[in-house]
Amino acid sequence: MMRVGIIGLGTIGRAHATSYTKLDEAQIVAVADLRAEELRADASLDRLLPPGREAITWYEDYRDLLSSEELDCVDICLPTYLHAEAAIAALESGLPALCEKPMALRLEDCDAMIEAAAKAQKPLMVAQCLRFWNEYELIRTSADAERYGKLLSMQLWRGSATPSAQSWMRDASLSGGAILDLHIHDVDYVQYALGLPMRIYAQGGCSVSPERGYDYVLASYDYGKGLQVSAAAHWADVSLPFAYRAHVRYEQAYLQMDSSHDPLLRIYRQAGEPELPQLAGDDAYTNEIRYFCDTVRNGCEPERCTPLAARNAVGLVMAEIASIERGVPVEVTEFVRS
C-alpha cells in the first residue's frame, strides 16, 4: 500500500482525496493544511480519509509533513503561487510529487521544478486532467486514427462565474487569473491532442481590473494545412455555473461535447440520430491519480503527462498574453521548450 501525503485540502484537495478512496493501491496517511485543527474536527471528512480523520496525521506546515512522515509520494493541492515552492521541497526530500495545475505562475518556476525533479531522480507530474478525461481522449484518438476522416476544426470553451470576493483566485498575482487557472485546461489539451502550434493569435482583456488578470480570452492556434483550432474561456460576474464544451469537426462526423448533456458526447453522422456513446471507466481525477501512482510504483517517468508538457502549457498561455498585448500573432518558439 502506497502511503500518500496531501498538501492542501481545499476544493481540489478534496476532489483528489475522493479519488484515492477508489484505489486499492494507495491511501492518504497525512495531510498538511493551514486549517489542520479545523479540518480534523470536521466529521464529513471521514468518508474522504478512510479509515477516518482521526487516523490521519495532521500538519499545519507542509515542511513538517515532509520531514516527519514516511511517505511514498505527495499530492500538492495548494494555491498556484505555492506550487513551485512545495514541489521543489518535496522533490528535495526525495519524494515523487503530483502537483495540481497550472504548474506555476512563471516559466522560470516551471523550469526550477523540472530541474529539481531531474536532480532528485523522482517523478514529477502536473495534474492536467483533460489528458485523462474519457470523452476528450475519444476526441484525440479519433483524430489520431482518422476514425472519421481527417480532423478539420476544433473549438474548445469553458467558463464560470468569477470566484468569490474572498478567494485567492481573484488576485492574478496568486492565481494567474482565468487565462492561466481556467483556460490552461484547454490550452494543454490542444498541445496534447495536436502537438505544439506554430503561432498563436489571441484576444482578451481584464473586464474589471488589472489585479484580477485576464478574465476572458479567445485564442486561435496555427497548425497550417487548413486546420482551424481555437479555445476560449471566461470568468463572468454573473451567476454562471461552471460549464465546458468542445465542438470538433472531422471529414465524416461532427463530435459535440457539452457539460450540460447526458451523456456528455454526441456524434453526428451524415444522416440519422446522433450516437450517444456511453464511455466506461473512472472519472479523470481518478484516472490521473492511478496513473501517477503506477508511475511511482514502477519507478518510471509520467510519459503521458510530462513536466515539460506542463511547462509548455504555461508557455502557450504566456504566448497568448503576449499576443493580446502586442496585438499580433506570436511565434510559440519564444515561449516553449523542446
What are these regions (language model features)?
Residues 1-51:
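N-terminal Rossmann-like dinucleotide-binding module
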Residues 16, 54-116:
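Beta-loop-alpha module in the N-terminal Rossmann-like domain of NAD(P)-dependent dehydrogenases
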Residues 26, 73-75, 111, 122, ...:
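C-terminal helix-rich "cap/oligomerization" subdomain common to oxidoreductases
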Residues 99, 124-126, 231, 257:
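Hydrophobic residues in well-ordered beta-strands that form the structural core
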Residues 123, 130-210, 327:
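Predominantly a Rossmann-like dinucleotide-binding segment in NAD(P)-dependent oxidoreductases
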Residues 181, 187-264, 289-301, 336-338:
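Contiguous beta-strand/loop segments that form the cofactor/metal-binding neighborhood of enzyme cores
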Residues 278-290, 305:
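Active-site loop of classical SDR/Rossmann-like NAD(P)-dependent oxidoreductases
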